[in-house]
Amino acid sequence: MPLTVLFWLISKARRWAFLTGLKSSVKVSAPVIIVGNISVGGNGKTPLVVHLAQFLQANGYRPGVLSRGYGGNSRDYPCAVTRNSQPSEVGDEPVLMRQRIHCPMVVDPHRGRGAQCLVEEHDCDVIICDDGLQHYALQRDIEIVVMDAKRRTGNHFLLPSGPLRESTARLGQVDFVVVNGQNTQSGEWLMSLAPSELVNLNNPTLHLALSELDAPVIAAAGIGHPERFYKLLERHKVKLKSCLSFVDHHAFQASDLPKERVLMTEKDAVKCRAFAHDDWWYLPVDANLDSEFEQQLLMKLRNVK
C-alpha cells in the first residue's frame, strides 16, 4: 500500500506540473484526440482507434494516427507506418491498424514530435493518439477512456496494489468513457465488438464463417486480456479444444503454435504470417458505437479552438 500511495503522489504531481506549465508540453495546430485508459491490460482501444479514423474520414476530415509503437525496435523517429512495415520495427498494433485504415500513421515515443510530423508533413487536420492518456507532454483537446465491461477498474487501487495508472477520479475529467462489452453506467457509452468471417493467414482471400466450425478448435491470443477473445468465440458457438495464452505483444515463433487449425486475433496474425500453417485463421472485429456518441464527438471537434 505505501508503494501505491507513492505512485499516486507521483502521477498526481506529474499531471499537475504539465497542467500548470511547470513542465513544458507540445501544442500542435490540429485537434488531438486521445484514446487511452486508466488501467493496465487490454481494454479495446485499437478497434476504437480504427473506427474513429474511418468515421472521421467519412465526415471529411484528414485524420492521422499516432502510436507509441510498443514492441517495435525502430530507432528512427518519427517512423511512418506503411503497408510494408513489420511488427518488429513499429509494433504489432500499428501494423494491424495500417491494414484497416487509409490515412497517415506514425509511431514515435515522443508523442509531441510524432503529432507535429502528422500535421506538418502529412497535412492532417486531426490527430488520433492511440494510448497516451498519461503522456501529458502532448496537449490534447478530447480525451476518450476505454474500459473493459467486466474488469472495469478492478479493486480501485493504483499500481502496484491494483490495475490503475490513475485514480478513478480521472474518469470524471475526460470527455467520453467508452465501455467495451455491456452494462454501462450513467454517462458511459457502449462499444461492442462485432466479429466478421475468419481470414486465412496464408491466403487472405480464403474466408470461413464461424458457424462453419463444427469440430473443436484451438484458440491462441497474445493480447492484454486473452479471455475476452475466447469468450467472444464461445458466444458465437465456437467449440474450443484448448486455449493458448501469451503475454501482450508476444513475439511469436513457429514453435509456439501447433500445425493444425488455430484461431487467433488479428493483432497476433500480423506476427505469424511469415511462418503460418495453412490452417491458421484470424478473426477481424469491428467496433460498433451509438450514433449519438459519434455526433457528440463531431460537435466537440468542431468546437475546438
From Swiss-Prot:
Q: Does the keyword Transcription apply?
A: no
Molecular function terms in GO for this entry?
A: ATP binding; tetraacyldisaccharide 4'-kinase activity
Q: Which keywords accompany this UniProt record?
A: ATP-binding, Kinase, Lipid A biosynthesis, Lipid biosynthesis, Lipid metabolism, Nucleotide-binding, Transferase
Catalytic activity as recorded in UniProt:
a lipid A disaccharide + ATP = a lipid IVA + ADP + H(+)
Give the enzyme's EC designation. Answer: 2.7.1.130
Q: Where are the transmembrane segments?
A: none
Which residues are ATP-binding? Answer: S39, V40, G41, G42, N43, G44, K45, T46
Mention one GO biological process in which this protein takes part, according to its record.
lipid A biosynthetic process
Which SUPFAM superfamilies does UniProt cross-reference here? Answer: P-loop containing nucleoside triphosphate hydrolases (SSF52540)
Please give the Pfam families that the UniProt record associates with this protein: LpxK (PF02606)
Q: Which GO terms describe its cellular component?
A: plasma membrane
Query: So, what pathway does this thing act in?
Result: Glycolipid biosynthesis; lipid IV(A) biosynthesis; lipid IV(A) from (3R)-3-hydroxytetradecanoyl-[acyl-carrier-protein] and UDP-N-acetyl-alpha-D-glucosamine: step 6/6
Q: What does this protein do?
A: Transfers the gamma-phosphate of ATP to the 4'-position of a tetraacyldisaccharide 1-phosphate intermediate (termed DS-1-P) to form tetraacyldisaccharide 1,4'-bis-phosphate (lipid IVA).
Sequence similarity: Belongs to the LpxK family.
Q: Which NCBIfam families match?
A: lpxK
User: Could you identify this protein by its name?
Assistant: Tetraacyldisaccharide 4'-kinase
Query: From which source organism is this entry?
Result: Pseudoalteromonas atlantica (strain T6c / ATCC BAA-1087)
What gene is it encoded by? lpxK
